[in-house]
């Protein structure tokens, strides 16, 4: 099937020239071209038209999950009949394995997987392996991390067709090799069930199942079914059943891998003994021998990705396979917001390598663990082929790579102008901003406020909320699905003011925003550079009443450059509108199709007044009293001490003894249920923040606090 755009709009403004310029450069064999497009000029629509004209598979690379979700929704709407896929990290929380030598602290890997995103990742790999040419994958930098060999993924795909001669038993063996597991009760993604001559397979990358009906040793019928009701959706003549996971291998490769791991273990043990590291040698021997037994018996072990080099057949130092290897040779890469995405790609390898080196040095992992890693920047460049850099503020790197092939897209199809910029003093800036917010709330328009710190964003949210303003804040500590849902609620008018730090700068498409307020605009730095200010100001460029207010007591060089460039663009846009008799018109709000797939609620309650994420609980008549009554663990007893029988063993619930200290805190014991709930959430937030900052010891501490508080809540009962 060919790419075919479904849209009521046609390219206009600067778009036709930009589309032709990019297509011409790609057809002539240019390695790179830059699309310099202002906010609201329809860069995504331009990319879609380039894909349609060139008819080549495409990777759309974004620098964070929120923007990837937005792009995914837009491309799904442009190409409803083509394979538009979504590929981001499937971890809601991820703390990698680490060792801190200074405190002799080993931290095990801890994670939480989002099943919906896992499904979408498998769907992306399956679409690329299907042989289809009409595939677009919208991805974060997660596509640079190692996954299974695409040849193994393809070879373990189970091809079935009506009339095929195969026994039911043999088919079941193939399904197990493809990482499906058998079940009779819990029918879910990645499982199959057998009922007489019928085998139902719940696909790994879909919400549908395949029913295979046998007549003897022949497949008699195939159908796509609803896994819940069993109702037939479609009759099939053939269907490929792709593996239920990305990391698949063959028995032969597994046997060879075990042998190679044993050989490398011997070498590393000899090395440790030769330099007098007996403890490290003993530690490594125990770990690897245990893992080998697990692999032999079960086919896997915890942390098996650290042995991926052996299963893939790679040599030491050779890059891992990643999603990009699943693409055909002639795919095109679009790097959205390239001025941010490129530096992020550059930084990925360093942090991973540093952590792995410590684990290897102290005997927790074999040296091969270092080859389970993200790509280096040079490796990324070597496999991406022709690339289109997309940004309103491209950096020197993109301009140099493009060798002068820069396509400018300044004029918007809607005729909208870049918003004018006003500079106002910081004295009484919050009160002044509150007045501006109320003006826009009266006419059902939205406001974005950008601060320098997360704390200030939260304090502003509290300040405005107490004054009747419907507001929310959003920053890096907010979970992925919640960020998407907050943005959707903002678009839908459930609240009027969205406050954030740097997350608001990049590509958020919110046409109802008529005011962008930049606090402390004269504090020169990363968040107030010319690039950052230009990007932030652009958030008001999709509204006919757009205005940018910079609160500052002086005008910095970055502010001057931003104001000058804005005035230049406005002059060009005004002249274009005059010549073509265009009157600026408001952009329609679009809904993000990914929200429901991530588990968000597009029909959230139409809250009146301030919107808040907190929940209310009934205050209990007493507080549970944790006390150390059991050896090795504590019993959480219920009721006041005065009501307890002296020698009674309370068995309402147990937690680990090493978590008990948290619950012995008199402050915790005096809290209401709502306060304990909030404390648990705060511990979760701190855990994620510490893990993101590679402070693994702190992350583990906050995780234990969170676990203890959650256990405390589980046994909460009213007297």
Regions found by a protein language model. Name each.
Residues 1-36:
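Conserved pre-motif I regulatory segment
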Residues 27-34, 56-57, 133-135, 445-446:
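Pre-Walker A (Motif I) flank of P-loop NTPase domains
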Residues 28-50:
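Walker A/P-loop
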Residues 34, 87-432, 436-442, 461, ...:
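N-terminal cationic and glycine-rich segments that engage phosphates or anionic surfaces
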Residues 80-89, 303, 446-448, 460-482:
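Conserved RecA-like helicase motor-core motifs
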Residues 151-155, 451-477, 708, 712:
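Conserved helicase motor "Helicase C" RecA-like lobe of SF1/SF2 P-loop NTPases
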Residues 478-500:
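Conserved helicase ATPase core of P-loop NTP-dependent helicases/translocases
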């Amino acid at each position: 099937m060919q790419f075919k755009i479904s849209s009521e709009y046609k390219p206009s403004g600067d778009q036709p020239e930009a589309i032709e310029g990019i297509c011409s450069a790609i057809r002539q064999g240019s390695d790179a071209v830059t699309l310099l497009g202002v906010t609201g000029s329809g860069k995504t629509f331009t990319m879609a038209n380039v894909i349609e004209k060139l008819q080549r598979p495409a990777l759309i690379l974004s620098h964070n999950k929120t923007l990837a979700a937005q792009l995914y929704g837009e491309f799904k709407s442009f190409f409803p009949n083509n394979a538009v896929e979504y590929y981001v990290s499937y971890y809601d929380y991820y703390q990698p394995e680490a060792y801190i030598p200074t405190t002799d602290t080993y931290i095990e890997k801890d994670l939480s997987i989002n099943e919906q995103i896992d499904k979408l990742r498998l769907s992306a790999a399956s679409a690329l392996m299907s042989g289809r040419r009409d595939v677009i994958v919208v991805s974060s930098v997660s596509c640079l991390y190692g996954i299974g060999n695409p040849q193994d993924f393809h070879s373990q795909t189970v091809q079935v067709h009506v009339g095929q001669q195969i026994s039911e038993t043999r088919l079941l063996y193939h399904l197990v090799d493809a990482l499906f597991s058998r079940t009779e009760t819990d029918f879910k993604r990645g499982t199959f069930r057998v009922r007489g001559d019928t085998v139902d397979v719940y696909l790994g990358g879909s919400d549908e199942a395949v029913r295979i009906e046998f007549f003897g040793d022949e497949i008699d019928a195939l159908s796509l079914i609803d896994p819940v009701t069993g109702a037939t959706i479609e009759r099939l003549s053939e269907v490929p059943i792709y593996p239920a996971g990305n990391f698949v291998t063959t028995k032969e490769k597994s046997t060879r891998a075990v042998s190679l791991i044993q050989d490398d273990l011997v070498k590393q043990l000899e090395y440790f003994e030769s330099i007098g590291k007996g403890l490290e040698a003993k530690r490594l021997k125990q770990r690897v021998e245990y893992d080998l037994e697990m692999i032999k018996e079960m086919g896997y072990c915890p942390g098996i990705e650290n042995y991926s080099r052996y299963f893939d057949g790679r040599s030491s130092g050779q890059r891992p396979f990643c999603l990009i290897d699943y693409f055909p040779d002639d795919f095109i890469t679009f790097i959205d917001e390239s001025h941010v995405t490129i530096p992020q790609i550059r930084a990925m390898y360093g942090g991973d390598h540093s952590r792995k080196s410590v684990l290897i040095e102290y005997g927790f992992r074999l040296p091969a663990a270092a080859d389970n890693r993200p790509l280096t920047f040079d490796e990324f460049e070597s496999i991406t082929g022709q690339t289109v850099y997309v940004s309103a503020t491209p950096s020197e790197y993109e301009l140099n790579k493009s060798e002068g092939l820069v396509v400018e897209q300044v004029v918007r199809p809607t005729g909208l102008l870049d918003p004018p910029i006003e500079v106002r003093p910081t004295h009484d800036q919050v009160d002044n901003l509150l007045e501006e917010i109320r003006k826009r709330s009266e006419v059902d328009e939205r406001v974005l406020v950008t601060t320098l710190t997360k704390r200030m964003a939260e304090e502003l949210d509290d300040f405005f909320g107490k004054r009747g303003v419907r507001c929310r804040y959003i920053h890096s500590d907010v979970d992925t699905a919640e960020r998407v849902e907050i943005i959707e609620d903002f678009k839908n008018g459930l609240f009027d003011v969205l406050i954030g730090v740097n997350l608001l700068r990049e590509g958020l498409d919110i046409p109802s925003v008529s005011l962008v307020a930049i606090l402390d605009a004269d504090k020169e730095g990363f968040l107030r550079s010319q690039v950052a200010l230009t990007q932030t100001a652009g958030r008001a460029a999709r509204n006919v009443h757009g205005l940018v207010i910079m609160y500052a007591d002086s005008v910095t060089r970055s502010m001057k450059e931003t104001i000058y460039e804005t005035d230049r663009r406005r002059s060009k846009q005004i002249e274009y509108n005059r010549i073509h008799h265009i009157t600026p018109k408001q952009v329609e709000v679009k809904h993000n199709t990914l929200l429901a797939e991530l588990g968000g609620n597009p029909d959230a309650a139409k809250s009146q007044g301030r919107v808040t994420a907190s929940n209310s609980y009934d205050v209990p008549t007493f507080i549970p009293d944790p006390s150390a009554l059991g050896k090795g663990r504590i019993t959480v007893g219920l009721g006041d001490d005065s009501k307890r029988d002296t020698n009674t063993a309370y068995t309402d619930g147990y937690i680990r003894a090493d978590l008990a200290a948290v619950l012995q805190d008199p402050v915790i014991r005096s809290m209401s249920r709502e306060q304990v709930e909030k404390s648990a959430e705060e511990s979760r937030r701190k855990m994620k923040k510490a893990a993101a900052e590679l402070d693994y010891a702190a992350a583990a501490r906050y995780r234990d606090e969170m676990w203890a508080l959650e256990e405390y809540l589980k046994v909460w009962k009213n007297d």
